[in-house]
Amino acid sequence: MESLRGYTHSDIGYRSLAVGEDIEEVNDEKLTVTSLMARGGEDEENTRSKPEYGTEAENNVGTEGSVPSDDQDREGGGGHEPEQQQEEPPLTKPEQQQEEPPLLELKQEQEEPPQTTVEGPQPAEGPQTAEGPQPPERKRRRRTAFTQFQLQELENFFDESQYPDVVARERLAARLNLTEDRVQVWFQNRRAKWKRNQRVLMLRNTATADLAHPLDMFLGGAYYAAPALDPALCVHLVPQLPRPPVLPVPPMPPRPPMVPMPPRPPIAPMPPMAPVPPGSRMAPVPPGPRMAPVPPWPPMAPVPPWPPMAPVPTGPPMAPVPPGPPMARVPPGPPMARVPPGPPMAPLPPGPPMAPLPPGPPMAPLPPGPPMAPLPPRSHVPHTGLAPVHITWAPVINSYYACPFF
């Protein structure tokens, strides 16, 4: 509540004449300006201490004390100009000075919470975090980008062997221009992907078997055969139109009996071979005379050298052939005479008319066949048909599906 200290009766009269409203409007405008100034200069206001605000308040109180004396002097001087005194602007100074301390206090109260937040413990800044222990940076591992040819070769090798040894991996790496570690990591990832796909296939086929109608299960050795029927394969069949009865084929006439083959005459047995009588022993061949040694040939006489060939004498130079006379131009012959057209061809005379063929004997009618027995009526065919039942085979090793369902 505002105190009336330092105000005179004329000030109270001014308030009754709506002067106070103008002052309040001015104070409101001043409040808006100071609030904007306070927002703009937070750092400056925060640095100021409370004793400075106290000294400002005391100075303002001192000015308030000096204002009533001026008003009293003005009242003592005379009240012959009341309208001029109402319009004098200095009268608003006491009001403004009186209103300023509460505004400063209000501004101080508004600015104190940010000041406490600024003066309070702050989070660690850049230099402090730099001094503290920092976690080591994780280096991002570079992924190998395989080409289409490398992937195709790796997939083909994986189809043959899922666990290649060191020698096979080194050969494959040298052929594909890769390192052995990269090939080993690729096979590990490929085996994990293969196992994951097997689990997905197992769950998918298990769900399909659960949805099927209750059927028997055939167990045979290490393979479990489970019939699986997919309800989505049930289709609605169009009712078939009745077909005309099919006439039966007449039975074939019996064939004449085959003439039996005459029996072959028996083969006479071969006479036994007469035993060879033991003859006298072969006389040994006497050795012939020894061959006389061939005498050596006499040495060949050396062939005498041929006499040197006499050089062929060069003939006289050939005289140049003189050019002959130019060929005479063949004169053009007379134009060819046009062949006159020949006489027209005489038409061929018509031949004698063809004699009609005599009619042949009439064809004998075919004898009627035996009557056909009527076919039994067909059973009713339902309009809704089911797809054929599929048999899924899966090898089971130690209660684990080792291969996908086929």
Curated annotation (Swiss-Prot):
GO CC, any one term: nucleus
Biased composition (Low complexity): 87-105, 113-123
Basic and acidic residues bias: start-end ranges: 74-83
One example GO MF annotation: RNA polymerase II transcription regulatory region sequence-specific DNA binding
UniProt keywords, alphabetically: Cytoplasm, DNA-binding, Homeobox, Nucleus, Repeat, Repressor, Transcription, Transcription regulation
Region (Disordered): 1-21, 33-142, 341-364
First and last residues of every Sequence repeat: 244-252, 253-261, 262-270, 271-279, 280-288, 289-297, 298-306, 307-315, 316-324, 325-333, 334-342, 343-351, 352-360, 361-369, 370-378
Name of this chain's protein: Homeobox protein ESX1
Taxonomic path: Eukaryota, Metazoa, Chordata, Craniata, Vertebrata
Gene name, Swiss-Prot/TrEMBL: ESX1
